Amino acid sequence: YNNRQISEENFMKQMEYLETCNTDWFDILCRNSVSQSHNLSITGGSQKVTYNASFGYSSSHGTQKGDDMTQFNARLNVNAQLLESLSVNFNLSNSFTDRKGYGPGVSPETYAKQTSRAIPFVDENGDRVFYKQYYEYKLNRTGQLEYGYNILNEMENSYSKNKAKNVNMSLNVNWNIVTWLQYQFVGSIAFNLNNSESFAGEKTSYIELNYRGYAYGSESSGSAKFKAALLPFGGELATNETNNTSYN
């Protein structure tokens, strides 16, 4: 308005809209946390052999929309008195955890805490609002640039995943050979696998700010900005896998 780029009437209309906007970011980005857990146990056997098996399932949906976790676990214990002087105990446990979250730089709860309620989520037509911020992209040297940011656009075009698998086995053997001689074996082995993945798609502001320097789809192949972009197409995928085996 000060630069006479919009009329006073339009300026006052926009001011009135912002004053009454009162966007509830927590309602848009957060939810009530819900979790559930189920367990099944089986016990049986005979005079010489007994066993106990259990199976479990749990899931939780965090207070931030898109923060979800699922876990499965199982356990087996077997005790066997093979001879009066020989006993064996075997234990096996296994768990699998799958967690889903957000891509780099995305935190719905932090955004809800720090963002003004005067910023609208959608415009008068119901379309998402991408509010303007400024940055400089070091590779194209075009000075200050403008980009549009919408938190749901970031959430829909980026993600993180983490999967963990754990298997543990142990075996105990006791053998009373004679009254003055006893043999005992204690052994265990554990397998741990962790796989994490983080992705930011080409439509996110994260890619525009760090790798491209212009809005998605705004530059044609061969333009100066297109040539200067570190990543003119696609997004960023980061993976990490840890595999560990231990025994004693």
Regions found by a protein language model. Name each.
Residues 1-22, 32, 62-67, 73, ...:
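Surface-exposed loop/interface segments of Gram-negative outer-membrane beta-barrel transport/assembly proteins
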Residues 55-61:
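Transmembrane beta-strand segments that form the barrel wall of outer-membrane beta-barrel proteins
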